[in-house]
Swiss-Prot record:
The keyword Amino-acid biosynthesis applies. Signal peptide: none annotated. Keywords: Amino-acid biosynthesis, Aminotransferase, Histidine biosynthesis, Pyridoxal phosphate, Transferase. It catalyses: L-histidinol phosphate + 2-oxoglutarate = 3-(imidazol-4-yl)-2-oxopropyl phosphate + L-glutamate. Its cofactor is pyridoxal 5'-phosphate. This is Histidinol-phosphate aminotransferase. NCBIfam families: hisC. The gene is hisC. The modification N6-(pyridoxal phosphate)lysine is found at K215. It comes from the Bacteria. Pathway: Amino-acid biosynthesis; L-histidine biosynthesis; L-histidine from 5-phospho-alpha-D-ribose 1-diphosphate: step 7/9. GO terms for biological process: L-histidine biosynthetic process. GO terms for molecular function: histidinol-phosphate transaminase activity; pyridoxal phosphate binding.
């Protein structure tokens, strides 16, 4: 009987390979979590409101105003969402016709663009970035624009840590000005703020930006993100968003995090993580099992190893959880390592050094 009921699910959902989140893969295993690009330290914010018997505002005005000040945009250009992930989904639901329209995404990159397209039976076109430089392949994007409504660009990119050329982004926006929305996912932009595209929202009506409080703001646990776009696009998304997407505790904590004092603390954490990243890269360069370290502008690094599977498993057994990227296009033998505290990074280095000395006759 249960098999008959399962067949009631949409065919594309039955076939769907779900997104493998860090928690879904790793659960609570280990004590050093370097697999989800989270902040290694928590922030001291608290939920102050006590009245929880009323439904929350669909779009909390105070929170939108605070974020508008932070990004220097108008309040009517901002939508609050349950993390940037909801923004990815809303755009597909609002703009793509099932079985007719398509999206483009550029692997190796964040998988939720593809997963959401599959959920809603939207065709997805993969246009890989140029190997090793990870820049956009504009020629192949142009050749694949037929029926494409949305183009997702993660910048800085997860998992490579690279940034797109701004000229390429401008060229892409010009190329698709009247035909497609270019969605720039800026989840990690606080680590390289000068690369943000917010200044160009007025010039390019087809530009949409996704933001989150999960990374530099160290608030992954509250699930709060934002869509930044022209007010007309925000109005469309407001038509289909859940009636009460942002809980009262989430809105309260998010609002507090946008106070100027907490923004300064966030910026200081970014400086610390950037320094830890440089330290970690310099230490990894001296280890014989490391084949290549890709340049990163974020709170994680992509490293190609000799014996990557064995190193991944060894770290797992030692309670150090990193993200295996070997299955992704052009990322053979690559592991993605979140930059942790100095103590966590030191422990990681010691374990890899010990492994290398034992099995590769290296340092």
């Amino acid at each position: 009987m249960i098999n008959s009921l399962i067949k009631l699910a949409r065919i594309n959902v039955q076939k769907l390979q779900p997104y493998q989140s860090a928690r879904r893969i790793g659960g609570q295993h280990g004590d050093v979590w370097l697999n989800a690009n989270e902040s290694p330290v928590s922030v001291e914010l608290s939920f102050k409101k006590k009245l929880l018997n009323r439904y929350p505002e669909c779009q909390p005005i105070d929170l939108i105003s605070a974020y508008a000040d932070y990004v220097r945009l108008s309040t009517n250009q901002i939508l609050v969402t349950r993390g940037a992930d909801e923004g990815i989904e809303l755009l597909i639901r609002a703009f793509c016709e099932s079985g007719k329209d398509a999206i483009i995404y550029c692997p190796p990159t964040y998988d939720m663009y593809r997963v959401n397209a599959e959920i809603y039976n939207i065709k997805y076109k993969e246009v890989p970035t140029i190997k090793n430089t990870w820049q956009l392949d504009l020629l192949n994007i142009k050749l694949n624009l037929n029926s494409v409504k949305l183009i997702y660009i993660c910048n800085p990119n997860n998992p490579t840590g690279s940034t797109c050329s701004k000229k390429d982004l401008f060229d892409l926006l010009e190329m698709t000005l009247n035909t497609s929305l270019v969605v720039v996912d800026e989840a990690y932009i606080e680590f390289l703020p000068k690369e943000s595209m917010t200044l160009y929202l007025k010039k390019y009506p087809n530009l949409v930006i996704l933001r989150t409080l999960s990374k530099a703001f160290a608030l992954a646990g509250i699930r709060c993100g934002f869509v930044l776009a022209q007010k007309e696009i925000i109005n469309i998304l407001n038509k289909i968003i859940s009636p009460y997407p942002i809980s009262i505790p989430t809105a309260s904590i998010a609002l507090e995090s946008l106070h100027k004092n907490y923004i300064k603390l966030m910026q200081n954490r970014v400086l610390d993580l950037n320094a830890n990243r440089v330290w970690l890269i310099n230490k990894l360069k001296k280890i014989s099992s490391v084949k290549k370290i890709f340049q990163s502008n974020t709170n994680y690094i992509l490293v190609q190893f000799f014996m990557s599977e064995e190193i991944f498993q060894m770290l797992w057994e030692k309670g150090i959880i990193v993200r295996n990227q070997d299955h992704k296009i052009n990322l053979k033998q690559c592991l993605r390592i979140t930059v942790g505290t100095h103590l966590e990074c030191s422990r990681l280095i010691e374990e890899i050094k010990f492994f290398s000395k034992k099995y590769l006759k290296g340092v």
